[in-house]
Each structure stands twice: as C-alpha cells, then as structure tokens.
C-alpha cells in the first residue's frame, strides 16, 4: 500500500462522513 493509496482512502472516508453529516443536517 502506497502513501497515495492511504491518502485516497482517508479522503474517501472523510467525504463519506461529511456527506452523511450534511444529509442529517437537512
């Protein structure tokens, strides 16, 4: 696993959490 892969996974996780929070905020 390369650093780029870890960064991509972390970003994806953050996007998922952020999106869920956005949906709940409505």
Swiss-Prot record:
Binding site residues for Ca(2+): 15
Assigned GO CC terms: extracellular region
Textual note on the cofactor: Binds 1 heme b (iron(II)-protoporphyrin IX) group per subunit. Binds 2 calcium ions per subunit.
Names of the cofactor(s): heme b; Ca(2+)
Signal sequence segment: none
Cited function: Removal of H(2)O(2), oxidation of toxic reductants, biosynthesis and degradation of lignin, suberization, auxin catabolism, response to environmental stresses such as wounding, pathogen attack and oxidative stress. These functions might be dependent on each isozyme/isoform in each plant tissue.
Family to which the UniProt record says this protein belongs: Belongs to the peroxidase family. Classical plant (class III) peroxidase subfamily.
Name of the protein in question: Peroxidase 1
Species whose genome carries this gene: Vitis vinifera (Grape)
